[in-house]
């Protein structure tokens, strides 16, 4: 046993220090990034925000809606091959280039993902997703996926430390997904005592990944557009959002009515709700590590997408970054004990 003495920080612990800027307008900011990935050799351009691969966020409807904003969607793994075929038949090539195919690590997951990828060559992203990316089995699956799909861009996670980030990249991942426990409906930290404050995890993993020519996704912990800006400022190449995109018409959650008001259910993928829906319940040997919440209906996702992108552009103007690519170089974080004036928050 040992204790690391240096303090680790989350998004709520910092603000971005403003700097002199020559930008005249938020409209001058370029949010689109262009990437060429280490192993696949594929190039991609777009806004590097990703709708999370949760079945109450990462839906086909969400992918179609967010593609118009140049935003990616990691489509959840619970769609059948037939449902994928129907989606592909009704989608343009532009929508498909903004789609990630999500998978677990079982043999059945591998075979199903292979069938989905064979449906259309425009499906270039594979998202290999488990709660704990530290197992040897997971690393072996990433290597197996790289061998099977040498030209596909593979993202893999989740991890929170530099050495594991490096191992996944060396095993074949182009992008590593970073985050254990920061999500709005994740209870891993309180059920297990395991986790890592998200901003510090992003900073550490970005440094490790970029040294090897890899990239990272900051997954979880964002509650406002300002948090998205902080994640990019900390070195994230992509930012994945779950709760911020939940509760919309495209989100796919079940709608319930209570006292005449309608709500949409949103739950973590290790919650009792998710496990009952997909595997029949919580196994005797494990605990649920997610919760279920009822969200007021939020309408179409386009309004939220515009709000996020507008906040990100504004953050860039405050530090003089004419492109999103420059934001991390222009970012200085200051540690704080307050984020906002909350006097009217309950009104």
Swiss-Prot record:
Q: Which domain of life is it from?
A: Bacteria
Keyword field = Metal-binding, NADP, Oxidoreductase, Potassium
Q: What is its EC number?
A: 1.7.1.7
- Gene3D superfamilies (alphabetical): Aldolase class I
SUPFAM superfamilies assigned to the protein according to its UniProt record, in alphabetical order: Inosine monophosphate dehydrogenase (IMPDH)
- Name its GO BP terms in alphabetical order: purine nucleotide metabolic process
Q: Which InterPro entries match?
A: Aldolase_TIM, GMP_reductase, GMPR, IMP_DH/GMP_Rdtase_CS, IMP_DH_GMPRt
Q: Could you cite one Gene Ontology molecular function of this protein?
A: metal ion binding
Q: What class of enzyme is it?
A: oxidoreductase
Q: Where does NADP(+) bind?
A: 108-131, 216-239
Q: Which residues form the active site?
A: 186 (thioimidate intermediate)
Q: Which residues bind K(+)?
A: 181, 183
Is Metal-binding among this UniProt entry's keywords?
yes
Catalytic activity of the protein: IMP + NH4(+) + NADP(+) = GMP + NADPH + 2 H(+)
Q: Name one Pfam family in it.
A: IMPDH
An annotated GO cellular component: GMP reductase complex
- What the protein does? Catalyzes the irreversible NADPH-dependent deamination of GMP to IMP. It functions in the conversion of nucleobase, nucleoside and nucleotide derivatives of G to A nucleotides, and in maintaining the intracellular balance of A and G nucleotides.
Q: Which family, according to the similarity comment? A: Belongs to the IMPDH/GMPR family. GuaC type 1 subfamily.
Q: Which PANTHER family match?
A: GMP REDUCTASE (PTHR43170:SF5)
- Quaternary assembly: Homotetramer.
Name of the protein in question: GMP reductase
Q: Which gene encodes it?
A: guaC
